[in-house]
Amino acid sequence: IMEKKYIYYPFMVLAMTVALSSCDDFLDEMPDNRTELDTEAKITSMLVSAYPETNYALLAEMSSDNADDNGGTWTAYNKLQEEAATWKDATYKEEDSPYSLWNDCYKAIAAANAALDAINTMGNPSSLDPQRGEALLCRAYNHFVLVNIFSKAYSPKTSTTDLGIPYMTHLE
């Protein structure tokens, strides 16, 4: 029985050597799982993700003066409401939080920029004018939302020193 066991070792070593050496070329290439935007249909599909998924209305309302004064009886429904209504630093990272709004808007801007880049790569055909317009609109809207939530109100006196938001016009 012992002799039969040792007969299989050379075959196993040979099989392992062949298996491991045959993967060399496959592992040398970096996988690229990005979708190539090379047709009108793919660009149109990409624009579906150029809209923010986060609803910023609650955040805007809670940090504004558009609220009822209930005296000492007001209680927050969740941590997001408490932080927004009392102007505390935002630590809440769930749905509709400042954190998710920031990330979702920049994901949407990236999708719009990808569509615009694909349209430019295709030579700006007039058949893609509606998609180009939608991508520009989505990019502008997302920047508008971000600047209204995260930036100071414009002041000619302090506009050169006030911080704004990163304005993304190209793919990263």
Predicted regions and their residues:
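Membrane-proximal, proline-rich intrinsically disordered regions
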Residues: 22-67
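Sec-dependent bacterial lipoprotein signal peptides
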Residues: 1-21
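N-terminal, post-signal-peptide region of Sec/Tat-exported proteins
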Residues: 59-88
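Secretory-pathway/luminal and periplasmic proteins that interact with or process carbohydrate-rich
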Residues: 55-60, 142-154
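Acidic helix-start/capping segments at beta-turn-to-alpha-helix junctions
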Residues: 67-68, 131-138, 159, 168
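Short coil/linker segments at helix-helix boundaries
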Residues: 149-172
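Conserved, well-structured interaction surfaces
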Residues: 82-150
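Terminal processing/anchoring signals of secreted or surface-associated proteins
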Residues: 2, 23-25, 112, 140
